[in-house]
Swiss-Prot record:
Record's protein name: Potassium-transporting ATPase ATP-binding subunit 1
Key word Transmembrane present: yes
Gene: kdpB1
Membrane topology: Multi-pass membrane protein
Enzyme class: translocase
Binding sites annotated in the UniProt record for ATP: D343, E347, F376, T377, A378, T379, T380, R381, M382, S383, K394
Primary subcellular site in the record, as a coarse category: membrane
A cellular component annotation (GO) from this entry: plasma membrane
Lineage of the organism: Bacteria, Bacillati, Bacillota, Bacilli, Bacillales
The species this protein was found in: Listeria innocua serovar 6a (strain ATCC BAA-680 / CLIP 11262)
Record field: catalytic activity: K(+)(out) + ATP + H2O = K(+)(in) + ADP + phosphate + H(+)
Length: 681
């Protein structure tokens, strides 16, 4: 907790937070703050003989109340200090640099140098290797390696290029190679880096709806206890006269009783719990645009997960050559390798490697063959090679069928059987055709990640439904979904289908989370309750999401849900503990405080506390000290366990509810004994 001097800064901030302007933000602790001021005033009145209050006792109460306020300030300051430490490293990346602003896009020598802080949206800048990108933007020309370690912590450079889903760049990152022409999409103060700094510092953190609702409950309880405490002075004065025994309660004891009964424990820690939750998300390299998004993550019960990269490893691998009748496996492998020689994808390279391993088929002299490679396009959905009068194509089954038919050939039914078999096994079939004759099928296998099935099982135990999103055909999607253990799948997914699926679940009352990186994902991201945009994605995707994953890892969504649930669990557990504490303190203080007037209350003095003075001091010391003991838990969070909500609630009620009842009885009695031994009371 005490990393690199954060505690020193927290101590200083704790004192600064004694300002009334800051104390007003926390109504429960404001009550303690006012109580401390009143007790201090009563001490001076008693010291100079103006009041009947015992000066020494009143001073002790006043000091303990001031420490209670300071401990609450310290909890918040520690949480904020962690954020500031994180923000300081980010600020080092935010420097005002000179940018080359292009006057004419066609002439890159026609530039004017302007400060990055003076750039406006729509300005075009030209950035060269080893220069810092001056402001957030969209690459409109060029391709280059970019070092984003200042923001993501990842040392390996990433590729940024115009077009596609890798066109967004972030101000403060550095070009490692080549050059880029960038259209500025943010102004100074509104950049991605500025938002990150504001969020981790807590400067822009607003209270979430759940926080506000809980604070209203705590304030209501405090007002009730305030009203009860205010009536005790006239009530005990009247009761003591009627009983002819005892005496009226002192104002100091009324203040102490009010502070003990008010929900000060959770009131002191509520802010630090929220800040720490945001900090845990930042440590996972995820930037949340609001605390509401983190809370929503904790309530999510439907996860939409991309197949590639999340459920499967992402690189399909050639595992078999399946020829049709009349064609040998080696003949198919030879044609498949020729069609893949110029294919730079992982799938293409795996086909070349498999042919080499199975049949020792080596490279050829393509210059001598007068070979012409045909690249894959979204229109043809095929790639291949033309050489010495021969034509080889490989691609999706329906694309090859259309190609063969268009060229007057015959597509064998046997090939359909092989394609169905491969798809049914969860693989991707690529059909190979040479000179308009179908040779067979390449079996590309999708490899499901290790341990993913167990993770989905844990999510199911928690009541979270998992849905795999894939562009594969329904048969392939069903096979992979069964192997991975997801609850459902959406095959041949389009942006419109994803958007409609989210709306359908939301109409049924579910909270939906999803990830996305492309402009076509933006509508679905905007609709989802928790929308995690990839940092490598487009500007449109980032703006549509309410979180950004700096690591651009699709599996991070599961971790985000875990952090959200941990935040809600921590707040609920400490609220339960605080309320249970108040109940225990009630039994500790009330009987001892009033048995002089009502002797029957002696039977309720379960802890056999020495005296009313000792009881009050013991309870109020415990009330302050317990805040310090709970600060690590509020920052670290309650340990998250994958189990149904009902079991989780029962477990936490047992630990924090029953624990909250027992702990004060033991601690207050021990403090009472210590005060007695030391002769303080």
């Amino acid at each position: 907790m005490m990393e690199n001097g954060i505690w020193k800064d927290a101590l200083i901030q704790s004192m600064k937070k004694l300002s009334p302007k800051l104390q007003v933000k926390n109504p429960v602790m404001l009550l303690v703050y006012v109580g401390a001021i009143l007790a201090t005033s009563l001490y001076f009145l008693g010291f100079f003989g103006i009041s009947d209050e015992k000066a020494g006792y009143t001073l002790a109460i006043a000091l303990i109340l001031w420490f209670t306020v300071l401990f609450a300030n310290f909890a918040e300051a520690i949480a904020e200090g962690r954020g500031r430490a994180q923000a300081d490293s980010l600020k080092m990346a935010r420097k005002d640099v000179l940018a080359r602003k292009l006057k004419n896009l066609e002439d890159k020598s026609d530039v004017i140098e302007v400060a990055s802080n003076d750039l406006k949206k729509g300005d075009i800048v030209y950035v060269l290797a080893n220069e810092q990108i001056p402001m957030d933007g969209e690459v409109i020309e060029g391709a280059a390696s970019v070092d984003e370690s200042a923001i993501t912590g990842e040392s390996a450079p990433v590729i940024r290029e115009s077009g596609g889903d890798r066109s967004a760049v972030t101000g403060g990152t550095t070009l490692v190679s080549d050059w880029l022409v960038i259209r500025v999409t943010a102004v100074s103060g509104e950049s991605f880096l500025d938002k990150m700094i504001a969020m981790v510092e807590g400067a822009s953190r607003k209270k979430t709806p759940n926080e506000i609702a809980l604070q209203i409950l705590l304030v209501t309880l405090s007002i009730i206890f305030l009203a009860v405490s205010a009536t005790l002075l006239p009530f005990t004065e009247f009761a003591s006269k009627q009983a002819g025994a005892g005496s009226a309660i002192s104002i100091t004891n009324v203040i102490a009783l009010l502070v003990c009964l008010a929900p000060t424990t959770i009131g002191a820690l509520l802010s630090s719990i929220g800040i720490a939750g945001m900090s845990r998300l930042n440590q996972a390299n995820v930037l949340a645009m609001s605390g509401r998004a983190i809370e929503a993550a904790g309530d999510v019960d439907v996860l939409l997960l991309d197949k590639t990269g999340t459920i499967t490893l992402g690189n399909r691998k050639a595992s078999e050559f399946l020829p049709v009748d009349g064609v040998t496996e080696q003949e198919l492998a030879d044609a498949a390798q020729l069609s893949s020689i110029a294919d730079e994808t992982a799938e293409g390279r795996s086909i070349v490697v498999l042919a080499k391993e199975r049949f020792d088929i080596r490279g050829r002299d393509f210059a001598e063959m007068h070979a012409e490679f045909v690249p894959f396009t979204a229109t043809t959905r095929m790639s291949g090679i033309d050489y010495q009068g021969n034509t080889i194509r490989k691609g999706a089954a329906d694309a090859v069928r259309a190609y063969v038919s268009a060229n007057g050939g015959t597509y064998p039914k046997e090939c359909d059987t092989i394609v169905s078999k491969v798809a049914g096994a969860g693989g991707t079939p690529l059909v190979v055709v040479r000179n308009n004759k179908v040779l067979g099928v390449i079996y590309l296998k999708d490899i499901v990640k290790n341990g993913v099935k167990e993770r989905f099982l844990d999510l199911r135990k928690m009541g979270i439904k998992t849905i795999m999103i894939t562009g594969d055909n329904p048969m392939t999607a069903a096979a992979i979904a069964a192997e991975a253990g997801v609850d459902d799948f959406l095959a041949e997914a389009t942006p419109e289908a994803k958007l409609e699926l989210i709306r359908e679940y939301q109409r049924e009352g579910h909270l939906v989370a999803m990830t996305g990186d492309g402009t076509n994902d933006a509508p679905a991201l905007a609709q989802a309750d928790v929308a995690v945009a990839m940092n490598t994605g487009t500007q449109a995707a980032k703006e549509a999401g309410n979180m950004v994953d700096l690591d651009s890892s699709p599996t991070k969504l599961i971790d985000i849900v875990r952090i959200g649930k941990q935040l809600l669990m921590t707040r609920g557990a400490l609220t339960t503990f605080s309320v249970a504490n108040d109940l225990a303190k009630y039994f500790a203080i009330i009987p001892v405080l009033f048995y002089g007037i009502f002797p029957q209350l002696e039977a309720l003095n379960l802890m056999d506390l020495t005296s009313p003075t000792s009881a009050i001091l013991s309870a109020i010391i415990y009330n302050a000290v317990i805040i310090i003991f709970l600060i690590p838990l509020s920052l670290k969070g309650v340990k998250y366990r994958e189990m149904p909500a009902g079991k989780l609630l029962s477990r936490n009620m047992l630990i924090y509810g029953l624990g909250g009842l027992i702990a004060p009885f033991i601690a207050i009695k021990l403090i009472d004994m210590l005060l007695t031994v030391l002769g303080i009371v």
